[in-house]
A protein has these predicted regions:
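Conserved P-loop NTPase motor "coupling/switch" region that bridges the ATPase
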Residues: 1-15
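Short amphipathic alpha-helical/adjacent loop interface patches that line ligand
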Residues: 1-2, 44, 66, 116, ...
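Helix-centric, low-specificity signal for extended rod-like, repetitive segments
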Residues: 6, 61-64, 135-138, 187, ...
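Conserved Helicase C-terminal RecA-like lobe
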Residues: 16-42, 52-168, 238-239, 244-252
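SF2 helicase/translocase ATPase core recognition
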Residues: 16-44, 141, 159-242
Length: 252
């Protein structure tokens, strides 16, 4: 791991299944620098300007601009092709090399399949073996790939958060990497529990890769404040829904 990257460590106690190995969560803060930082600020300012022109009371417009910023945090070329660098991708590859060198196997989750495709290409270039699963994977092929990984075929398993987050057993891995924060932390917990479940014999470590000083950090702050965050953000009708004003604060 690159020296100097800040880590936030939290140890979790399992209340229901005491016989499970320990699960440790680590938030790895990835700084955006140079052109990558400038590009983020340009996207943020443009989003605010767009919303100031008439969209800041419109939940759908706000969420669309937030989505654009969140995609940029994952990999800038997804939003601005002229920004060639991608600090999060490089941090991920460094982490995967370290884990491979220590003979660990890894589950890698992202909600963005186009980002997963970029990760897949880099993984292939690095010579790492892997399985892949997203919402387009047919059920039979999904079962085959899960079984293959459990048999030892693949250093890592790349998965979309929604397609791979529930209903499968991947205890052959003892590391989990969450590449981008989802609104609802329970969804991330479900993804991590693909490895941390009955049948797991080793301690499990979960890494969250977060772009420093960006909307991703704001989402993590909301994780701590609201347990029903997905409903609050996406349901514009309930009394608990986040107001447009609250959503606008995520751009700060």
């Amino acid at each position: 791991m690159r020296a100097g990257l800040p880590l936030i460590l939290r140890r979790l106690k399992r209340e229901v299944l005491d016989d499970l190995p320990e699960k440790t969560e680590i938030t790895l803060s990835v700084p955006l620098e140079g052109d990558e930082r400038a590009g983020y600020e340009a996207c943020r300012v443009k989003a605010l300007e767009t919303l100031e022109k008439g969209g800041k009371e419109n939940r759908i417009s706000i969420l669309a601009e937030l989505m654009r910023l969140r995609r940029y945090c994952c990999h800038p070329p997804l939003v601005l092709p002229e920004v060639a660098s991608g600090a999060k991708l490089e941090a991920l590859m460094e982490l995967l090399r370290d884990l491979k060198g220590a003979n660990h196997r890894v589950l890698v989750f992202s909600q963005f399949t186009d980002f997963l495709s970029i990760v897949e290409e880099r993984v292939r270039q690095e010579g790492l073996t892997y399985q892949y699963l997203d919402g387009t994977t047919p059920p039979q092929e999904r079962e085959r790939r899960v079984a293959a990984f459990q048999r030892g075929e693949g250093d890592l398993f790349l998965m979309s958060l929604k397609a791979g987050g529930t209903g499968i057993n991947l205890t052959a891995a003892n590391y989990v990497v969450l590449l981008d924060p989802w609104w609802n932390p329970a969804v991330e917990d479900q993804a991590a529990d693909r490895a941390h479940r009955i049948g797991q014999r080793n301690p499990v470590t979960v890494y969250r890769l977060i772009a420093a000083d960006t909307v991703e950090e704001r989402v993590l702050e909301l994780h701590r404040e609201k347990k029903e965050l997905a409903r609050d953000v996406l349901d514009g009708t309930g009394s608990s829904a986040l107001t447009p004003e609250a959503l606008m604060k995520l751009f700060e």
